[in-house]
Amino acid sequence: RYRIFSQEVQSWPDVNNVTYGKTVDADAARRRAYGFRTFPAAGSACSFLVLNDIHGKADYLTRLCKHVDFSELGFVAFNGDMSSSVESGEQLFKAYLDASAALFAAETPILFTRGNHETRGVFADSLGDYFPGQDGRFYGIYRYGDVCILLLDCGEDKPDDHAEYNG
């Protein structure tokens, strides 16, 4: 179980001199801690949801998942093109991360693999900061009990000189 707290840093003029503000409980109204689960070491049952081609439409994501019981799922897989490009951290939250947190991400694990659109945009190189994979890669093999899950990163589908990139 875990809770989320935040403490303001009011000033930090040097490494040995930090002035802190008050600490706040980010979710005081919740009244209970979040749960957290890892993948089981054994077992043959595996239920999961795959989401892709959301293209930053958080309202669509919310409607799509309206009747999903996430407590019944082992994980959710983001299977590419969750946004149309990657322009900033703020854009990722607006595009789908805030909606995902409200729906399931506080307690349901996410597996992430890039689509061709996640390789586009000025912030694309920072995407791994939000979805750290095995050894910094967006591909890999995961075990969920006796089930083996293979994530592939197929990258971009067009050369750099393609007309879509003004080439």
Language-model segments: which ranges?
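Active-site neighborhood of divalent metal-dependent phosphoester/pyrophosphate hydrolases
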Residues: 43-59, 68-165
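Surface-exposed intrinsically disordered loops and tails
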Residues: 20-22, 163-167
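Acidic, histidine-bearing metal-coordination/catalytic regions of metal-dependent phosphoesterases
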Residues: 1-50, 70-72
